[in-house]
């Protein structure tokens, strides 16, 4: 498993490979150009991490400028749930405050974006490029169906959707209890192959495999990186740094 960030044209940016023509996406890591200092620096995009709010606002502005984004990203108030915010509609979740863990965009060029610091970021795009989505998938959201909820409100047949999985916690660092395995098995009979035995009743979960199972079952074409946010100092990691951890931004937009 790779634990480093590859060199790209822009420091701290991991480009999402395999997206359709006319669609761009990727992750802005801790090393992206920004103004945060200390444990958050140089780039932290999370507002509730203990960082200076003015620094976070500046980092978000830098993101827009550095990537030449067509508009402000559609920031969500994430709650580790299954809510999906759909641009221009109120379907699943709170549309007014954007309280959700996924967003779908089809009517504009606004970037869909999620924040993460170990949880799995997933980007979706229709093969035509006319519909895009971003998903924040922790184990609770995966088990409860955040992927399925997102696909259910998209107008595109899942068999014509491309998925990209961004950097998340690696299996060797993701120690969990038996309740996580039990929750995953409820709606995924193949989830067992994503767990390795640890000491006692402890297990090590492969969040990439757990998400891949569900995406492929739906018919999506799946790709993406296999990093470990915990072991890479270029990444923010809640499990490694605790409540003071910053947040990375993973976004997708139509160019």
What are these model-predicted stretches?
Residues 1-255:
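Active-site microenvironment for binding and transforming phosphate-containing groups
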């Amino acid at each position: 498993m790779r634990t480093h960030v590859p060199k790209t044209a822009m420091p701290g940016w991991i480009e999402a490979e395999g997206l359709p023509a006319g669609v761009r996406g990727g992750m802005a890591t801790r090393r992206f150009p920004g103004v945060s200092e200390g444990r958050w620096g140089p780039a932290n995009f999370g507002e509730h991490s203990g960082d200076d709010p003015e620094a976070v606002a500046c980092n978000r502005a830098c993101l827009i400028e550095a990537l030449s984004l067509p508009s402000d990203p559609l920031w969500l108030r994430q709650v580790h749930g299954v809510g999906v915010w759909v641009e221009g509609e109120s379907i699943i979740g709170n549309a007014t405050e954007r309280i959700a863990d996924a967003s779908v965009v089809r009517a504009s060029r606004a970037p869909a974006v999620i924040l993460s610091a170990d949880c799995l970021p997933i980007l979706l795009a229709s093969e035509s490029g006319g519909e895009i989505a971003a998903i924040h998938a922790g184990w609770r959201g995966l088990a409860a169906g955040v992927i399925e909820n997102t696909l259910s409100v998209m107008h595109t047949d899942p068999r014509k959707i491309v998925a990209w999985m961004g950097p998340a916690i690696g299996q060797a660092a993701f120690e969990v209890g038996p309740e996580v395995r039990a929750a995953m098995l409820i709606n995924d009979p193949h989830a067992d192959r994503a767990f390795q035995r640890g000491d006692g009743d402890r297990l090590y979960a492969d969040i990439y495999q757990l998400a891949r199972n569900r995406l492929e079952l739906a018919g999506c074409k799946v790709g993406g990186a296999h990093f470990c946010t915990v072991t890479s100092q270029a990444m923010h990691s809640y499990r490694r740094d605790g409540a003071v951890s910053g947040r990375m931004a993973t976004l997708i937009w139509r160019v």
